[in-house]
Design a protein with these regions (language model features):
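Non-transmembrane, aqueous-exposed alpha-helical and coiled segments at domain scale
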Residues: 1-424
């Protein structure tokens, strides 16, 4: 397929990074089109194990162009630290294989500060922010109060624009939160250090993408987080502040007339969730601890223990629909190998009524999971490489999910390594 998107179907952390790393062998370009450094895509390959927060997961493939699109929250400090980490591991990163849209807005130090202050203000009603400044950043973007990456090439204009925005931002920091104002000298020093480092990577990437398309090149669009964290269709207000859907790829990349040929939705073989908000099928106690340890379920960015539960067919079916998924990659099937019986959430019960439809967000706190148990396979499947290698119980489990969500499962991962994948 010439134009494909890889997206999350659930709450994020489904394994999108490992799928992009695998599939980049088939693509010429990888584009991150939304989100920022608030989540991580874990990739395991010959270079080592990495949690990529901003850099597209195609960075490990020779000859692949990696682009951060205009829809990304561009944190130049975190981006530069990520570049240095990868270079130390022997990964080649130059302006030829990593490009930043000149239309991407800069996430500034005051965005992280405001994020922390807002979480403190909310106290027990906090949203579980990673405190990377994402919500304040996107709020400012839609108020037209951000600096564009391309402005780094025009220092006189940047200086005037910075002064204007900083004066406005300090009204919020001092008036709403009672914080000290951010000093202009401090921000100028930050820009001189990190803005100058990323400036060679800044290009008119929309123009480059149009050229690649005209040359017949294949492009893979990499989303952050998952459908249930989408700003419009997720579990509001416990969402991210950008659109995590495949439908946003044309806008967030700058290739505005794009028509995707394929949308690969990534689903974990069980459910995980980082942060606050309703999580209907959540496991607690020793059962949760066992699954969390088996899957090493800790946040790639924060290290926070992830909430865990059985695969949620209600939420997954909804995620498949709003993502417009044409195929599914089911990840971490091997993690369930320790279970004699595997729980599956098949429906919700709300106020005494059973439903298989994902409800409006305000009803989620009143929803209880309807759980059934299926036979486990209770053996190591990490060496399986073709469908027939899997035990019958594992194949039955995959096919049950496939039937329930109405979308073909084309990939099944049985380990973190690049080749630990079954194609169907």
């Amino acid at each position: 397929m010439q134009y494909s998107a890889i997206v999350g179907i659930n709450w994020g952390d489904e394994g999108k990074g490992r799928m992009v790393d695998l599939l980049t062998a088939e693509y010429d370009c990888v584009v991150r089109y939304q989100g920022g450094g608030n989540a991580g895509h874990t990739v395991v390959n010959d270079h080592g194990k990495f949690a990529l927060h901003l850099i597209p997961s195609g960075i490990f493939r020779d000859g692949v162009v990696n682009i951060l699109g205009n829809g990304v929250a561009l944190d130049s400090e975190n981006l530069w630290q990520e570049i240095e980490t990868l270079r130390l591991a022997g990964v080649k990163i130059t302006p030829d294989n990593l490009m930043i849209s000149d239309r991407a807005s800069l996430l500034m130090p005051w965005h992280r500060l405001q994020d922390e202050l807002e979480e403190l203000r909310l106290r027990d009603k906090k949203y579980g922010s990673t405190k990377q400044g994402i919500a304040p950043f996107y709020a400012d973007k839609y108020q037209k109060k951000t600096l564009l990456a391309g402005e780094l090439n025009y220092p006189d204009s940047l200086r005037e624009h910075l002064k204007e925005i900083l004066g406005w931002k300090n009204l919020t920091l001092t008036g709403v939160y009672g914080a000290e104002p951010v000093r202009e000298e401090q921000i100028k020093a930050w820009i001189e250090e990190y803005g100058e480092k990323i400036r060679p990577f800044i290009r008119d990437t929309a123009k480059i993408l149009r050229r690649l398309r005209d040359e017949g090149k294949s492009i893979l669009f990499e989303a952050q987080l998952g459908a249930l964290r989408d700003l419009d269709f997720g579990i509001v207000p416990y969402t991210t502040s950008s659109n995590a859907l495949a439908a946003y790829a044309p806008v967030g990349s700058g290739l505005t007339d794009l028509r995707l040929d394929q949308v690969i939705g990534v689903v974990k073989a069980y459910s995980t969730c980082v942060g606050e908000g309703p999580f209907v099928c959540e496991m607690l106690g020793p059962e949760a601890a066992a699954l969390r340890e088996a899957g090493a379920e800790y946040g790639a960015k924060t290290g926070r223990p992830r909430r865990v539960g059985p695969v949620d067919l209600v939420a997954t079916r909804y995620g498949v629909k709003i993502q417009g998924a044409t195929a599914i990659a089911l990840t971490k099937l091997d993690v369930l190998s320790y279970m004699e019986k595997i729980p599956v959430c098949t429906a919700y019960e709300i106020d005494g009524e059973r439903t298989e439809e994902f409800p409006f967000p305000v009803l989620l706190d009143r929803a209880n999971p309807v759980v059934e148990y299926v036979d486990g396979w209770h053996c190591d499947i990490s060496g399986a490489r073709i469908w027939a290698d899997l035990p019958e119980a594992a194949r039955n489990y995959v096919e049950r999910i496939e039937r329930a969500v109405g979308c073909p499962i084309r990939y099944v991962s049985v380990g973190p390594e690049r080749d630990a994948i079954i194609r169907r």
